[in-house]
């Protein structure tokens, strides 16, 4: 199984799909998230008003959680927190990134502990998303989750969505997903229904559990990571399992 390069992953968002292990960078088969909701969702950019090239989640007033491809493919210079749009400064907050660090146990070859934290120049006014419990009790096989991003809405030749999109996906048990992909405990799989998926301009974006009636109850359970194809029946997307990184996250966010 070959992990395509980060540059190639971005290229395939507009060209022919890579049939191999593909970094997931789009949302399709879903719908538009209402403006002014899910405002913990962050777009990672190289300029304040430029296009979002990766997704992330505000997990403290001064930290955005994403995946390592988002710190390696391009330099993350700004995040747009609370925005509904792919680019521009018409809403949300555009905040400068002052540092980026990958998980201390990140293994590029196996894909374990694929997490990165961006530290912001100033606190965001938006409310961070809740982190899951470290005991993994917030994830149950068969539960429904939601992935979000600004990626293309059709595959393979779609264009990026100007508005934030979301799609509902069923969570798989790891032993079930292990029959399809070689994954470990730091991953979680979701999806597998035809035409509904995360795929090839929003890696690092959130997979959430909607735990109540409002966004304040949402729990961040995963980060868009990789998979084979897009929206194929029986082929889910692999997400970084956030519960396995809570100790590291807390050590960074509380130490700064």
From Swiss-Prot:
Classification of source organism: Eukaryota, Sar, Stramenopiles, Oomycota, Peronosporales
Gene Ontology process terms (BP): proteolysis
Homology family: Belongs to the peptidase S1 family.
Intrachain disulfide bonds: 54-70, 177-189, 199-230
Location, primary (coarse class): secreted
Signal peptide: 1-15
Organism (species): Phytophthora infestans
Oligomer and partners: Forms an apoplastic complex with host endoglucanases in tomato leaves during P.infestans infection.
Glycan attachment positions: 87, 102, 107, 157
Annotated GO CC locations: extracellular region
Keywords: Disulfide bond, Glycoprotein, Secreted, Signal, Virulence
Domain of life assignment: Eukaryota
InterPro entries (alphabetical): Peptidase_S1, Peptidase_S1_PA, Peptidase_S1_PA_chymotrypsin, Peptidase_S1A, Trypsin_dom
Localization per Swiss-Prot or TrEMBL: Secreted
GO molecular function, one term: serine-type endopeptidase activity
SMART domains attached to this UniProt entry: Tryp_SPc
Limits of the Peptidase S1 domain: 27-254
PROSITE patterns reported in the protein's UniProt record: TRYPSIN_DOM
Task performed by this protein: Secreted effector that suppresses host plant glucan elicitor-mediated defense responses. Targets host endoglucanases and inhibits the endoglucanase-mediated release of elicitor-active glucan oligosaccharides from P.infestans cell walls.
Protein name according to UniProt: Glucanase inhibitor protein 2
């Amino acid at each position: 199984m070959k992990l395509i390069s980060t540059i190639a992953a971005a290229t395939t968002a507009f060209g022919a799909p890579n049939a191999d292990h593909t970094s997931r960078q789009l949302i399709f088969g879903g719908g538009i998230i209402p403006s002014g909701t899910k405002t913990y969702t962050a777009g990672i950019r190289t300029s304040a008003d430029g296009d979002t090239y990766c997704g992330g989640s505000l997990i403290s007033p001064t930290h955005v959680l994403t995946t390592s491809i988002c710190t390696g493919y391009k330099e993350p210079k700004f995040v747009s927190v609370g925005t509904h749009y792919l680019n521009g400064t018409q809403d949300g907050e555009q905040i400068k990134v002052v540092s980026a660090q990958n998980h201390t146990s990140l293994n590029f070859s196996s894909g374990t502990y694929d997490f990165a934290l961006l530290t912001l120049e100033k606190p965001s006014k938006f409310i961070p998303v809740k982190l899951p419990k470290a005991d993994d009790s917030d994830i149950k096989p068969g539960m429904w989750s939601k992935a979000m991003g600004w990626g293309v809405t059709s595959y393979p030749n779609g264009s990026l969505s100007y508005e934030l999109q979301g799609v509902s996906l069923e969570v798989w048990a790891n032993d079930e997903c292990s029959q399809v992909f070689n994954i470990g405990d730091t991953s979680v799989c979701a999806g597998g229904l035809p035409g509904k998926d995360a795929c090839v301009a929003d890696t690092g974006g959130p997979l959430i559990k909607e735990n109540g009636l409002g966004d304040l109850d949402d729990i961040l359970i995963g980060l868009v990571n990789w998979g084979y194809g897009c929206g194929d029946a029986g082929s889910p997307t692999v997400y970084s399992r956030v519960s396995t990184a809570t100790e590291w996250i807390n050590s960074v966010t509380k130490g700064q």
